[in-house]
Curated annotation (Swiss-Prot):
Interacts with HIF1A. Belongs to the CEP135/TSGA10 family. One of its GO terms (biological process) is cell projection assembly. Processed into N-terminal 27-kDa and C-terminal 55-kDa fragments. The modification Phosphoserine is found at residues 161, 702. Signal peptide: none annotated. This is Testis-specific gene 10 protein. GO terms for molecular function: structural molecule activity.
C-alpha cells in the first residue's frame, strides 16, 4: 500500500485519498478480526482439550476409588473368614502358622512398602527435580519469549507510530509532490514557452544568418561593383581631363565669340531699350493674365474637388448610416445574448451553490463515517483487551476448572460481538463505498459546472468587449458623420463664393485678352530679331550644358555609390548589433533552461530520497515480519521438543507399568497363598500408583497448557 501510494504518478483527489485511508483502516480491522477469530478458535480447542483431560482424570480417579473400595471389602471378608476358621481347635496350629506367616508377610509388606515408598519418593523427587528443572528451564525460556514478545510488541508499537508518522510524512510528501507537480507543470509551461521563444529566436537567428549571408553576398557584389565603379571613375577622370582640355579650347573660342557677342549685345541693348518698355507692358499683362488663369484653373480644380468631396461625403454618409444601422442591429443582438448569458450564469451559479452544499453534506457524512471507523477501532482494541483478560482468566482456569461454563459463555459472547462487528464493518464498508462514489460523482459534476461557468464567463467577457467595441465604433461613426455634414456645409458656402468670384474673373479676362492682342502684334517683330541672336547663343549653351550634364552624371553616380557603401556599412553595424542582442538572448535563455533543469533535478532527487525512506521503512517491516516468523518457528520447535519429552515420559510410564506387571508375575509365581494375600495389598497399592502417576500427568498437562497459552 505504501509502495502504491509512493509510485502513483498522478496525484488523486483529497476525497479519494481519504477513501483509500478508510479502506486501509477497514482492511487492517478485518485482519485483526481474523486474527482474533483464530485466537478464539485456538482458545476453544484448548478448552475442549482441558475438558477432555479433566473428564479422563475424573474417570481414572473414580475407577481407582472403586478398586480401592473393592480391595478393602475383600480384605475385610478374608479376615472375617479367617477369624471364623480360627475358632475351631483343629486350626490352632494352622492359625499360629498363619499368624507367623502374616507377621512375616506384614514385615515383608512393610519392607516392600518402605522400599516402594522410598523408590517412589526417590522417583518422585527425581521427576519433581526434572520437572522443576524443565519447568525452570521452560519458565526461563517462556520469560525470554515473553521478553521477546514484549520487545516485539514495543517494536510493533514503535513501528505503528513510525507508520503513522510515515503516513503523515507521506501525506505531507504527497502535498509537496502536488505542489512540486504544479510547480513542475508551471515550469514545464514556462519551459514550453521558453522553448517556443527559443525556437522563434532560433528561427530569427537562422533568418538573420540567412540575411547576413545574403548581405555578405550583396556586400561582395557591391565591393565588386565598387571596384568596377572605381575603375569607371578612373576612366571618367581621364575623360574629365580630356574634357577640361577641350573646355579650355572651347573657352578660348567662347572668348572670341564673346567679343562678337559684345558687339551684338550693344546692338541688342539698343533694341532692348525699345523692347523693355513693351516687354514691361506685356509682362505686366502676362503676369496679370497668368495670375487670373491660375486663379481660374485653381477655382475650377477646387470646384471639382469640392464636388468630388461632396459626392464622397454623401457616399461615406450613406455607408456610415448603413454601418450604424448594422452596428445597432449587432448591439441589439449582443444585448439579447448578454441577457441570455447573464440568466444562464445566474442559473449555473445557483446550481453551483446547490452542488457545493451537497458536497459539504457529503464531506460531513464522510467525517461521520470516519468517526464510526474510529469507534470500531476503539471497540476492536477493547475486544483485544477483553481477549487478553480472557487469556488471564484461562491461566486462572488452570487451577480452577469449575469456572469453565462462565468462560464458555464469555467466548460465546465474544463470538456474538465479533459477528455483530463484522456486520457493522460490512455496513460501514458499503456506506463508505457509496459515499465515495457519490463524492466522486459530485466532484465530477462540480468540475463540469466550473468548466461551463468559466466558458460562459469568457463568452460574457468577449461579448462585453465586442459590445464596448461596437459602441465605440458607433460613436466614432457618428462623429465622422457630423464632421462630414459640417464639411459639406462649408464646401457649399465656398462653392457659392467661388461662383461669384469666377464671374468677376471672366469679365476681367475679356478685358485683358483685348490688351494682349495689341501687345502680341508688337512682340512678333521683336521676337524675330531675338530669335536670331538666341539661336547662336543656344548652340553654345547646348554644348556647355551637355558637358556639364556629363560631369554631373558622373558626380551623381559617385555620390550614389558612396551613399550605397554607407548604407551597407550601417546595415552591417545594425546586423552586428542585432546578432549580439540575439546571442545575449540565447545565452540568457540557456541560463534559464539550465537553472530550471537544476531545480527539476533537485526536486527529483528529493522525491527519490523520500522513496528510499519509504523503501527502508518497508524493509524494516519485512525484517520484523521475518523475525516474528522466526520466533514462531522457535515456538514450534519448542512444541516439538515438548512432544518428544511427552513421548519419552510415555515410554517411561510404559516401562514402569511393564516392570510392575513383571513384579506381579514374580509375586504370583512365588506362592499361591502369599499371592492371594498380596492381591488386596496390590489393590490397595494401586491407588497410590494412580496418585503417583496423577501429578506427573498434571505436570505434563500443565506444561502443555502453559505452552498452548504462550502460543495462543
Amino acid at each position: 500500500m505504501m509502495r502504491n501510494r509512493s509510485k502513483s504518478p498522478r496525484r488523486p483527489s483529497p476525497t479519494s485519498r481519504a477513501a483509500n485511508c478508510d479502506v486501509d483502516l477497514l482492511k487492517s480491522t478485518a485482519r485483526d478480526r481474523e486474527e482474533l477469530k483464530c485466537m478464539l478458535e485456538k482458545y476453544e480447542r484448548h478448552l475442549a482439550e482441558i475438558q477432555g483431560n479433566v473428564k479422563v482424570l475424573t474417570s481414572v480417579r473414580d475407577k481407582t476409588f472403586l478398586l480401592y473400595e473393592q480391595a478393602q471389602e475383600e480384605i475385610a471378608r478374608l479376615r472375617r473368614e479367617m477369624m471364623k476358621s480360627c475358632q475351631s481347635p483343629k486350626s490352632t496350629t494352622a492359625h499360629a502358622i498363619l499368624r507367623r506367616v502374616e507377621t512375616e508377610r506384614d514385615v515383608a509388606f512393610t519392607d516392600l512398602r518402605r522400599m516402594t515408598t522410598a523408590r517412589d519418593s526417590l522417583r518422585e523427587r527425581l521427576k519433581i527435580a526434572q520437572a522443576f528443572n524443565e519447568k525452570a528451564h521452560l519458565e526461563q525460556r517462556i520469560e525470554e519469549l515473553e521478553c521477546t514478545v514484549h520487545n516485539l510488541d514495543d517494536e510493533r508499537m514503535e513501528q505503528m507510530s513510525n507508520m503513522t508518522l510515515m503516513k503523515e510524512t507521506i501525506t505531507i510528501v504527497e502535498k509537496e509532490m502536488k505542489s512540486l507537480a504544479r510547480k513542475a507543470m508551471d515550469t514545464e509551461s514556462e519551459l514550453g514557452r521558453q522553448k517556443a521563444e527559443n525556437n522563434s529566436l532560433r528561427l530569427l537567428y537562422e533568418n538573420t544568418e540567412k540575411d547576413l549571408s545574403d548581405t555578405q553576398r550583396h556586400l561582395a557584389k557591391k565591393k565588386y561593383e565598387l571596384q568596377l565603379t572605381q575603375e569607371k571613375i578612373m576612366c571618367l577622370d581621364e575623360k574629365i581631363d580630356n574634357f577640361t582640355r577641350q573646355n579650355i579650347a572651347q573657352r578660348e573660342e567662347i572668348s572670341i565669340l564673346g567679343a562678337t557677342l559684345n558687339d551684338l549685345a550693344k546692338e541688342k541693348e539698343c533694341l532692348q531699350t525699345c523692347l523693355d518698355k513693351k516687354s514691361e507692358n506685356i509682362a505686366s499683362l502676362g503676369e496679370s493674365l497668368a495670375m487670373k488663369e491660375k486663379t481660374i484653373s485653381g477655382m475650377k480644380n477646387i470646384i471639382a474637388e469640392m464636388e468630388q468631396a461632396s459626392r464622397q461625403s454623401t457616399e461615406a454618409l450613406i455607408m456610415c448610416e448603413q454601418d450604424i444601422s448594422r452596428m445597432r442591429r449587432q448591439l441589439d443582438e449582443t444585448n439579447d445574448e448578454l441577457g441570455q448569458i447573464a440568466r444562464e450564469r445566474d442559473i449555473l451559479a445557483h446550481e453551483n451553490d446547490n452542488l457545493q452544499e451537497q458536497f459539504a453534506k457529503v464531506k460531513q457524512e464522510n467525517q461521520a463515517l470516519s468517526k464510526k471507523l474510529n469507534d470500531t477501532h476503539n471497540e476492536l482494541s477493547d475486544i483485544k483487551q477483553k481477549v487478553q483478560d480472557t487469556n488471564l482468566e484461562v491461566n486462572k482456569l488452570k487451577n480452577i476448572l469449575k469456572s469453565e461454563e462462565s468462560t464458555n459463555l464469555e467466548v460465546n459472547k465474544l463470538k456474538n460481538i465479533l459477528k455483530s462487528e463484522e456486520s457493522e464493518n460490512r455496513q460501514i464498508m458499503e456506506q463508505l463505498r457509496k459515499a465515495n462514489e457519490d463524492a466522486e460523482n459530485w466532484e465530477n459534476k462540480a468540475r463540469q459546472l466550473e468548466a461551463e461557468n468559466n466558458t460562459l464567463k469568457l463568452e460574457l467577457i468577449t461579448a462585453e468587449a465586442e459590445g464596448n467595441r461596437l459602441k465605440e465604433k458607433v460613436d466614432a461613426l457618428n462623429r465622422e458623420v457630423e464632421q462630414h455634414l459640417n464639411a459639406e456645409r462649408s464646401y457649399k458656402s465656398q462653392i457659392a463664393t467661388l461662383h461669384k468670384s469666377l464671374v468677376k474673373m471672366e469679365e476681367e479676362l475679356q478685358k485683358v485678352q483685348f490688351e494682349k492682342v495689341s501687345a502680341l502684334a508688337d512682340l512678333s517683330s521683336t521676337r524675330e530679331l531675338c530669335i536670331k541672336l538666341d539661336s547662336s547663343k543656344e548652340l553654345l549653351n547646348r554644348q556647355l550644358v551637355a558637358k556639364d550634364q556629363e560631369i554631373e552624371m558622373m558626380e551623381n553616380e559617385l555620390d550614389s555609390a558612396r551613399s550605397e557603401i554607407e548604407l551597407l556599412r550601417s546595415q552591417m553595424t545594425n546586423e552586428r548589433i542585432s546578432m549580439q542582442n540575439l546571442e545575449a538572448l540565447l545565452v540568457a535563455n540557456r541560463d534559464k533552461e539550465y537553472q530550471s533543469q537544476i531545480a527539476l533535478q533537485e526536486k527529483e532527487s528529493e522525491i527519490q530520497l523520500l522513496k528510499e525512506h519509504l523503501c527502508l521503512a518497508e524493509n524494516k517491516m519485512a525484517i520484523q515480519s521475518r523475525d516474528v516468523a522466526q520466533f514462531r518457528n522457535v515456538v514450534t520447535q519448542l512444541e516439538a521438543d515438548l512432544d518428544i519429552t511427552k513421548r519419552q515420559l510415555g515410554t517411561e510410564r510404559f516401562e514402569r507399568e511393564r516392570a510392575v506387571q513383571e513384579l506381579r508375575r514374580q509375586n504370583y509365581s512365588s506362592n499361591a497363598y502369599h499371592l492371594g494375600s498380596m492381591k488386596p495389598n496390590t489393590k490397595c497399592h494401586s491407588p497410590e500408583r494412580a496418585h503417583h502417576r496423577s501429578p506427573d500427568r498434571d505436570l505434563d498437562r500443565s506444561l502443555e497448557e502453559n505452552l498452548c497459552y504462550r502460543d495462543f
